[in-house]
Amino acid sequence: MIKALFFDVDGTLVSFNTHKIPESTIKALQMAHDKGVKIFTATGRPLQLLNNIPEVQHLMDGYILATGALCIYGDTTVREDFIPHNEVMAFVDYCSKNNIPTVFVGKKDIQIYNRNEMVNHVLYDMLKVTYNKYDVPLEEVIDQGILQITSFITDEQEKDILPQLPGCTSARWYPSFTDITSATADKANGIRAIAKHLGIDISETMAFGDGGNDKSMLMAAGIGVAMGNAVDDVKAHANYVTTSVDEDGIKNALMHFGVI
């Protein structure tokens, strides 16, 4: 029996085409919630940038954020996983030398380093981010502990810098940037932490995703569902492929497995 659902946000809950949550998804989550199933996001976004799910915010029991680096259930922080400080500083140096725009996500605040128009376009035009409070200096954000680095680097630059960050891993869910986290921070470990906190078995969880940073949780969950709009590599890591986010994919999968 499925007792907890975990949803990626962009491309899974929220359509990249409409930038909205389909009505069928809202109704499906409400039905699952009414049956006592716990509902969580599992997203690369930090909490400050999670502004695109207002229609279902009231249904969320908790959040897996920053690709698993921060896990919250209710008001309880279940898991925090920070990037090693020396590797954060090494990446700052790399960004400085190569003029790379990068978002540093601290425990409390966010700062954008080398901000440019491309960053503004992706965050505010493409991903519809509304957060714009970047008044805390980067040094202070780093001192809080860095949960995630979202860097607008090319694939080649990513391959160049990652060997210098042995305590980190990366995952790309949008072409323009990659999310860098602690090597032990991923959505799968986030689900494991939440399941342990809830006192349920991992086999009683179900995860939905479409992007590269979803593969680990699709394999870890009791049932891993890839959206129809996912790339083939993600689909290959899932137990089941549903229809796309715009074609009632979440509702269809929840009905298929008898969750609703």
How should each PLM-predicted stretch be described?
Residues 60-66, 81, 124, 170-174, ...:
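Short hydrophobic/aromatic-enriched beta-strand-loop microsegments
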Residues 94, 98-208, 212-217, 229:
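Conserved acidic, metal-coordinating active-site core of Asp-based
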Residues 1-4, 22, 180-260:
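Mg2+-dependent phosphoryl-transfer enzymes with acidic/Ser/Thr/Gly-rich catalytic loops
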Residues 36-40, 59, 145-149, 203-205, ...:
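Short active-site oxyanion
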Residues 3-18:
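Asp-based phosphoryl-transfer active-site loop
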Residues 23-118:
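Active-site phosphate-binding/coordination module
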Residues 56-59, 66-67, 164-167, 220-221, ...:
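Short, structured coil segments at secondary-structure junctions
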